């Protein structure tokens, strides 16, 4: 069987990648045809074909976030590569090993006005350094790049392919799945001393990890952080900021002496106030090159701890009381009919329906904050969310990538493990094209996407933009109502659709998806005009 030099190079590129990968996302194109045919001839790779490079890159991101190993997205030259920038940006800031493998014209065509030709070298800048492969002797650069901390960042592999691109015969099937060679590499910032006899609070966010020495310390944990042994509700931060409270003649200090930040917490303004309070000693623990210190006053930075002393019982009681006050306040406010059916009610229903072994993907903006307020993280439930740059784009594709990665872990099970995604309506519509899955492609077998549809940007109701004095221009600039018929949208893409107008409707629909798995979208029709008052009431419960 004859092959072209371009096909020979493509084969060597995929061969260099194959020890590190299990999945490939492939986009149609001419210049990348040698890479496409080579990938489809490999029996050791799961291939997912998508026609939109932007969606494809986010699908690869969703897969890679769960697998914690590289997932390449392969495309042709030109703007096809540019469309990967949003996913690359999230991957870079979330330290996810996304690989963009782009086909390119040979060097002699760059700058000549040749069709579909741009300078693709370093197109992503420092976010994803370019590895140029223009000849077989360059292929070794791929292994070198993957060995130099690719686990901490995305990479761009730019493969220059000259004509003729492909021979008239298909390559033979080959490749045998073996163990994937990929080791997560972390940055070690050293060890820090921690005196637990002081009033200490841990704040854990995305990219946090379990630290045995701090297990007994009261912890505000975001949904994507490990489950805390001694959890503190995030709204309790407002209570802890009081400094002192008095009752029955006693004065109790509520402000912590020492805060330990683990990972990358970003969700709640009250928590941010604690982190940036210059009167509170701050230690930041990180295993990446990102140090989460928004107030720029960290006293110490490390990756490991050496502890002395024990937590004071009085401090533990204060944190428990503050957390209980916040959690009870959430339940009381949600029970009030005057607030209607909001996104927070949707999050509560989703949380209540989760079981051990379920996986959650949550879009940025209100949904992830709402899940945090209603109690996540839960034991036995993994939560994934784009917290690197916290954008809503690519959410549908990432949710699908999450579900596909989870079901690939259990190929022999009759029923794939359940994945539940919570998205706002703008996040869903923004990436509606992610619903397009070809008839020959792997499909999620047990994915439920819940869309909290308040017909616009509900988060802006809670921010300064929602102030009464700005209402006359709020809807057009921030509310951005769209009136999209989500039922018709799902029908166009062949996705099962359900509608929930009330909390009870939603609970029933979620229960049905447990009994009858598949790929389903549930639209929860909510209101947003009460969100500002609801949030104000929640905050008042702990102030």
Curated annotation (Swiss-Prot):
InterPro entries: MenaQ_synth_MenD, THDP-binding, Thiamin_PyroP_enz_TPP-bd_dom, TPP_enzyme_TPP-bd. Gene3D superfamilies: 3.40.50.970, TPP-binding domain (3.40.50.1220). It holds the Pfam family TPP_enzyme_C. GO terms for biological process: menaquinone biosynthetic process. Pathway: Quinol/quinone metabolism; 1,4-dihydroxy-2-naphthoate biosynthesis; 1,4-dihydroxy-2-naphthoate from chorismate: step 2/7; Quinol/quinone metabolism; menaquinone biosynthesis. Binds 1 thiamine pyrophosphate per subunit. One of its GO terms (molecular function) is thiamine pyrophosphate binding. Its cofactor is Mg(2+); Mn(2+); thiamine diphosphate. Keywords: Magnesium, Manganese, Menaquinone biosynthesis, Metal-binding, Thiamine pyrophosphate, Transferase. It catalyses: isochorismate + 2-oxoglutarate + H(+) = 5-enolpyruvoyl-6-hydroxy-2-succinyl-cyclohex-3-ene-1-carboxylate + CO2. It is an enzyme of class 2 (transferase). It comes from the Bacteria. Its EC number is 2.2.1.9. CDD domains: TPP_PYR_MenD, TPP_SHCHC_synthase. Catalyzes the thiamine diphosphate-dependent decarboxylation of 2-oxoglutarate and the subsequent addition of the resulting succinic semialdehyde-thiamine pyrophosphate anion to isochorismate to yield 2-succinyl-5-enolpyruvyl-6-hydroxy-3-cyclohexene-1-carboxylate (SEPHCHC). Homodimer. Belongs to the TPP enzyme family. MenD subfamily. PANTHER family: 2-SUCCINYL-5-ENOLPYRUVYL-6-HYDROXY-3-CYCLOHEXENE-1-CARBOXYLATE SYNTHASE (PTHR42916), PROTEIN PHYLLO, CHLOROPLASTIC (PTHR42916:SF1). NCBIfam families: menD. This is 2-succinyl-5-enolpyruvyl-6-hydroxy-3-cyclohexene-1-carboxylate synthase. The lineage of its organism: Bacteria, Bacillati, Actinomycetota, Actinomycetes, Mycobacteriales. The gene is menD.
